[in-house]
């Protein structure tokens, strides 16, 4: 078997197999997001987190998980539109670094007449790593999904030309 025949067989198999790499990376992005919000929400420093930003953060996390799960199922079936959504969500994950973690890292609250830092540096680094890892997983899942959907579409077009 030649190299071209191997590639042709691999492309033909794509019609019958799922894009598990993109799907798995999207699910891994959800896992990193869960680690992020557990790390944020379990730290209780006075009443700093109990405001509208926390409510928006909870809503954002729920929407993130629902959307990424839907996209993981979409890219599994080689649908490029879901892969593009994953790229956008990856960009939003990077943007989220500058909302809650940056504000909490620079903030202090007074408890029992003592100034306490809301988010210590170790926690700050941890949540940044979680959000960045989630974003990277979304980006890679999106890029792989777009590439594989294009390869499959091109292969399907050549099959249609052979039939016609």
Give residue spans per PLM region.
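Interfacial non-cytosolic loop connecting adjacent transmembrane helices
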Residues: 41-53, 97-131
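Membrane-water interface at the C-terminal end of transmembrane alpha helices
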Residues: 129-156
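Alpha-helical transmembrane segments in multipass membrane proteins, preferentially the mid-helix core
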Residues: 62-73, 140-148
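Cytosolic juxtamembrane helix and N-cap/initiation of the first transmembrane helix
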Residues: 1-35, 144-150, 162-164
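Membrane-interface helix-boundary motifs at transmembrane edges
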Residues: 9-17, 46, 72-82
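Generic alpha-helical transmembrane segments
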Residues: 29, 50-68, 93-96, 133-134
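Loop-to-transmembrane helix junctions at the membrane interface
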Residues: 66-102
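Canonical alpha-helical transmembrane segments of integral membrane proteins
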Residues: 22-37, 59-61, 87-96
